Amino acid sequence: MELQESTNRLVELIRHSQSPYHTMKEAISQLEKAGFERISLAESAALEPGKAYYVSIYDRSLAAFRVPQSGFKGFCIITSHIDNPCFMIKPNPERKKSDCITLNVERYGGPILNTWLDRPLTIAGRVCVATDDPFNPKTMLYNSKKPVAVIPNLAIHMNREVNKGVELKVQTDLEPIVSLIGAKENTQGWLLGKIAAELGIEADSILDYELFLCNGEEPSITGFDDEFLSAPRLDNLTSCQSCLNAIMDTEALSDICNLVVLFDNEECGSSSKQGAGSVILSSILEKIYLNTPDTDKSRTAFIDVMLHSLTASLDVAHAMHPNHPEKNDPTNPIPMEGGVVIKMNYNQRYATDTNAVSIVEGICRAEKIAHTKFVNHGDAVGGGTLGSILSTSIPAMTVDLGVPILAMHSSRELMARSSQLAMDQFAEAFFK
């Protein structure tokens, strides 16, 4: 893959992924165009050797895999997450303030709050609509497509300390303005009325919703030599696209099952039925193995397969900030063009160990892929990600990797395009 194609694929995913549900839709579209067949998690039909399948997990997470051609010695797994720090719209959200309608929101994950101010914001997510069967409501995706909300700053004349750093409160400072009250006598239910009209349904048919405030700005290639990509949701759509590229652009192996999993809810701890902290991955792995023809169906045989498996957990890493180099480890700085970052933490906030590091090093050296090692500054406590969580539920060696970015958890982040290409190349080599 060349640099421009790598960037183009990522940019297209970002444009189509206003919410995690839209990321799911775009990922499924890419997989189906590449010949992957959808199967149900509840099915137990025999899988065809060499064939490619995908499974939707509660419409919130996704697994795609290629069945081995013959035999079954282990899994080669790459994981990522589809959610990002943002704000979600609460029930009964409309509030009258001055002559404006604002929306009551809840913080999702750990966003850098002030980066959401004064930006054009969209609303996207899903609504559940009543049907004749109460146990089977209909789900519909929603995307306002155009900017419909803004969270305005307080003018410096009214907030003289703003440039010294002012704490923002979600309930007080971060309710987005979405309309003027005007002649609207009753604003309760106003938002659902707008959404229902766009979807062509009755407002009272909407039973519930999960709606996100989203940064609606376009990704932008920047730098005098076009080195950078500035965009919303680089955490963690960079990794999602590398996962998809790897599973789509490689063929089934003889006796190893290549598998990618895109999880939801990483940004809020992964403790959900569709998150990495659930039993869902181990259940999928076991079903794949048991439904593959000519495998030993014993529990012991499956455990042996897992012990011969390897997982790469992909999530963005911290590049060294040029204005704050003191925040990085003094002997392990991470350049923007660091390529594949091997994330290490001896207290196991990252799952990486010496054996896993050596495997990644070997692949990168053989393929001449840029790579480096990340450790936290000795006086800082870093974040965790999927690798350590997955290591508690599946007995497979795991390594945490990512591309280096700046402004992680900002509403708009920055990366070097070459690092995305390096991760694309690594993920493909990992599956070969």
What residues fall within each predicted segment?
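N-terminal hydrophobic/helix-forming segments and targeting peptides
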Residues: 1-432
